[in-house]
Amino acid sequence: MFVNLNKSLIAQRFAKARQSYVENAIAQKKISHHLCHLMQAYCPLHLSRIFEIGCGSGNLTQELFVSFQIQRAYLNDLYDEVKQHFLDEQPIEWCIGDIESLSLPEHLNAIVSSSAIQWVQNLPQLLGRCHHALNDQGWLCLSTFGSDNFKEIKQLTGQGLSYWSVQDWQVHLQASGFELMKIEQQQLKMQFDSPRAILKHLKATGVTGTVATTQPHWNKQSLAQFYHDYCQFQTDDGHYELTYHPIYIIARRTS
């Protein structure tokens, strides 16, 4: 079974986890750093108007401010509290709300997003809107996740998000009028001291929308069973693995 997304619940969980996220989102920081590195290899230095989908605590945003010449950054997220992570003097304009129902800024040089668009339910429609919002030759630079993301959790609970493959992205980007400049994927194996620490990590990063960590069937017995079953993912040195499966995309508007 795959999770039916409740956007208001997702917003509540990320808002609740906003402080612990900064400390615990180690994988997300690595992913945003690598996305910025890829952008530096392909995009021009001057990106005067950018729009970021799901800016969160600003991991990607701050890297972009350091690496590119940005005159105006339009930042989106589901909840208002993200503003506390940013400086007042930064050239930011806020677009708070669900990206699937918000109007996008126009005449953009780049649209970026790191570890956020997996929550979007109608990706083809969003790609079409991004194409319309970008200038000719504008850049679409994303990191999202593939099917092996949290595969351990999915195997044990049967719950998780439905993800596009690299091939899906290639097809849909071309259909939406983008030239794919670079696409690559990784598998990041995070290690924890216990299965309980993994559930705490997911809660601390606000991503419990992908697992049933707040569902009624999590009782003492079912948690004990989950901890027991997770032992199959124990490494030789006694740690427990959780897989992140990021996909990186650098594309350019062509028509």
Swiss-Prot record:
Keywords: Biotin biosynthesis, Methyltransferase, S-adenosyl-L-methionine, Transferase
Molecular functions per Gene Ontology: carboxyl-O-methyltransferase activity; malonyl-CoA methyltransferase activity
One biological process term in Gene Ontology: biotin biosynthetic process
Pfam families: Methyltransf_23
Cross-referenced InterPro entries: BioC, Malonyl-ACP_OMT, SAM-dependent_MTases_sf
Top-level taxon: Bacteria
Signal peptide: none
Pathway info: Cofactor biosynthesis; biotin biosynthesis
Enzyme class: transferase
E.C. numbers: 2.1.1.197
Reaction it catalyzes: malonyl-[ACP] + S-adenosyl-L-methionine = malonyl-[ACP] methyl ester + S-adenosyl-L-homocysteine
UniProt cross-references to NCBIfam families, sorted A to Z: BioC
Family note: Belongs to the methyltransferase superfamily.
Biological function: Converts the free carboxyl group of a malonyl-thioester to its methyl ester by transfer of a methyl group from S-adenosyl-L-methionine (SAM). It allows to synthesize pimeloyl-ACP via the fatty acid synthetic pathway.
PANTHER family in UniProt: ARGININE-HYDROXYLASE NDUFAF5, MITOCHONDRIAL (PTHR13090:SF1)
The protein's name in its UniProt record: Malonyl-[acyl-carrier protein] O-methyltransferase
Gene: bioC
